[in-house]
Regions:
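Chalcogenol-based redox active-site neighborhoods
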Residues: 1-182
């Protein structure tokens, strides 16, 4: 299934890391960041989750509820949350139903071998349950900034502000050589 910005986000109900059901439609009235990632405790997924963790207060301040979703089970999610001190819920989609609804269970290729896996995509869903943004080329180190960039150019994470500050430093002109004697 291919989804588009402006469409109603497909509703679903899956368990979080504690076995508690999470239904997307029950979150109406809140903005939701629904990020699909391949696997708990792998390098890229850890970088992405930690970027969201480090900027969680900023995301909450902007009104977002963050939900990660993978095909991992609840026990693996619990370990990942404990190890990385993640403040948001991780959803278990072991049967891949939500992945299929959102078009994130896809054929991939590595070293010429084809296999099925999770496309690292994020869906930003507004308070009415409408898809506001789809991020298909996720930058795991700067994911929060990708989420906030859409329509909110004045909001940036602390890491982005540091990068911006470094970029705005201007070089001082080279000192003029002393005039040689005539």
């Amino acid at each position: 299934m291919s989804l588009s910005i402006g469409e109603k986000a497909p509703d679903f109900s899956v368990n979080d890391q504690d076995g508690k059901p999470v239904r997307l439609s029950a979150l109406q009235g809140k903005k939701v960041v629904l990020y699909f990632y391949p696997k708990d405790m792998t390098p890229g997924c850890t970088v992405e989750a930690c970027n969201l963790r480090d900027n969680y207060k900023l995301l909450i301040k902007q009104g977002y509820e963050v939900l990660g979703i993978s095909t991992d089970n609840e026990k693996t999610h619990q370990k990942f949350i404990a190890k990385e001190n993640l403040p948001f819920r991780l959803l278990s989609d072991t049967d891949k139903q939500v992945h299929n609804l959102y078009g994130t269970w896809v054929e991939k290729s590595m070293y010429g071998r084809k296999y099925m896996g999770t496309a690292r995509n994020t869906f930003v869903i507004d308070e009415k349950g409408i898809i506001e943004d789809i991020i298909e080329k996720v930058d795991t180190k700067n994911h929060t900034d990708q989420i906030l960039r859409k329509g909110q150019a004045n909001v940036a994470s602390p890491a982005a502000k540091k990068v911006a500050a470094k970029k705005t430093v201007t070089k001082q002109p080279a000192s003029k050589k002393a005039k040689s004697k005539r």
